[in-house]
Amino acid sequence: MKKTQYNNLVSSYARVLFHVSGSRLGIIRKEVEFLLAFFKDQRDVFVYLSHPMISFAHKKEVMLSINEHLSENLVKFIMVIFANKRSSLLILILEKFLSLARENENEFEITIKSAETLKESDIKIITESLSFLGKIIKVSNVVDPSILGGFVVRYGFNLIDASLKSYLDRLVDLSKMEILKVRNFV
């Protein structure tokens, strides 16, 4: 299966869980956060659950042992994933669901790429200027010397490029256009 097909499949399952959650979205969200943390701490459990040779009955048994922390709807949803032999995608589906839930609550994570590590005061200025978008729940500062200066902010599928590299690239493009104009008139 191609990567886009996997992404579509993951998104489809996540949207189903999102819509099924309805008025219980906050509760399901907390349970999904718990489950993801559990799988991160107990990696062996997820490896066991995602193994194709483990029977559906055994997977169901494991999920029912965790059931005291999960609502019936979430357990049933996970059982559908197991029945459809998509257990290896479970973590991706749950992460995508969290992304949809955050988007619904107007919460988002931002990544600030800069040529060097930013000071807290600089990060605060950037996050305050983006606060009109919603609640920023996580900020990551990634160092990339290739941007030369300035910064690039990514949130969701959006990008704000205030880097020196992109400015210089635009300047080069404008220069090329002007040279072509002059060449055409001569």
From Swiss-Prot:
UniProt-annotated location(s): Cell membrane
GO MF terms, alphabetically ordered: proton-transporting ATP synthase activity, rotational mechanism
Membrane topology: Peripheral membrane protein
One GO CC term, this protein: proton-transporting ATP synthase complex
Cross-referenced Gene3D superfamilies: N-terminal domain of the delta subunit of the F1F0-ATP synthase
Keywords: ATP synthesis, Cell membrane, CF(1), Hydrogen ion transport, Ion transport, Membrane, Transport
Family matches, as InterPro entries: ATP_synth_OSCP/delta_N_sf, ATPase_OSCP/d_CS, ATPase_OSCP/dsu
Name of a matching Pfam family: OSCP
Disulphide bond pairs: none
Record's function text: F(1)F(0) ATP synthase produces ATP from ADP in the presence of a proton or sodium gradient. F-type ATPases consist of two structural domains, F(1) containing the extramembraneous catalytic core and F(0) containing the membrane proton channel, linked together by a central stalk and a peripheral stalk. During catalysis, ATP synthesis in the catalytic domain of F(1) is coupled via a rotary mechanism of the central stalk subunits to proton translocation. This protein is part of the stalk that links CF(0) to CF(1). It either transmits conformational changes from CF(0) to CF(1) or is implicated in proton conduction.
Subunit structure: F-type ATPases have 2 components, F(1) - the catalytic core - and F(0) - the membrane proton channel. F(1) has five subunits: alpha(3), beta(3), gamma(1), delta(1), epsilon(1). F(0) has three main subunits: a(1), b(2) and c(10-14). The alpha and beta chains form an alternating ring which encloses part of the gamma chain. F(1) is attached to F(0) by a central stalk formed by the gamma and epsilon chains, while a peripheral stalk is formed by the delta and b chains.
NCBIfam families xrefs: ATP_synt_delta
Protein family (similarity comment): Belongs to the ATPase delta chain family.
Name assigned to this protein: ATP synthase subunit delta
Record lineage: Bacteria, Pseudomonadati, Pseudomonadota, Alphaproteobacteria, Rickettsiales
